Amino acid sequence: DKQKATQRKNRGRLIRVALVGYTNVGKSTLMNLLAKSEVFAENKLFATLDTTVRKVIIENLPFLLSDTVGFIRKLPTDLVDSFKSTLDEVREADLLLHVVDISHPDFEDQIKVVEKTLADLGCSDKPLIIVFNKTDAYTFTPKEEDDLTPKTKENVSLDELMQTWMAKMHDACIFISARERDNIENLKTMMYNRVRELHVQKYPYNDFLYQTYTDEE
């Protein structure tokens, strides 16, 4: 689609951040929060079929944020064309935010599906932050003290999961609730630091980092 290609080309010297993830993990809700827009957020498959791009400013730093269609295990053939522009957006992104529904019982399998899709797109080496969403909906069943059976994933607390993933990902993951707006400011700080770092690398002579921006611009 030539028009979309031209639009992408004309976005200037701004770092591009793409929200990626399995379908129905809360990407559009997070997009609404970060971009203060009303992206169609609905609890069903493929609520976002087109790619939505917004200019976002955190502190003095503008960048482009795109909300992409959710990945699934087996993409229906008739939907492949609809995914073309969203996949181009992922390929052209400088930073990926991999949004995960941590309250879903199969969230680890969903992570693997997304990682495989990114690998198929040749995007495995892109800078990435895992955003574990829906912490407000996470539930687990504590084991009784005298229960000697092996612990299952149903017995793992949110704190234990956080410790495991933060040890694995170091500073490249964060736990939030977009719906409850929990930990969003820390996510913004993390995004600001990564985007600023990428911007200095990619556009070392662009001085807008030292200007003051407002949300209205």
Can you say where each PLM-predicted feature lies in the sequence?
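Conserved G1/Walker A P-loop phosphate-binding module
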Residues: 1-91
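Conserved Walker B
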Residues: 68-69, 75, 102-103, 134-135
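Inter-motif core of Ras-like GTPase G domains
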Residues: 79-104, 116-123
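Short acidic (Asp/Glu) and glycine-rich catalytic loops that position anionic groups and cofactors
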Residues: 66, 92-96, 166-171
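Residues at alpha-helix caps and immediate loop-helix transition turns in enzyme cores, especially N-
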Residues: 79, 109-110
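Generic enzyme active-site microenvironment
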Residues: 65, 99, 131
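C-terminal-of-GTPase-core extension/linker across diverse P-loop GTPases
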Residues: 1-36, 105, 109, 116-217
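The start of beta-strands in P-loop NTPase/AAA+ ATPase cores
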Residues: 62, 93-96, 128-129
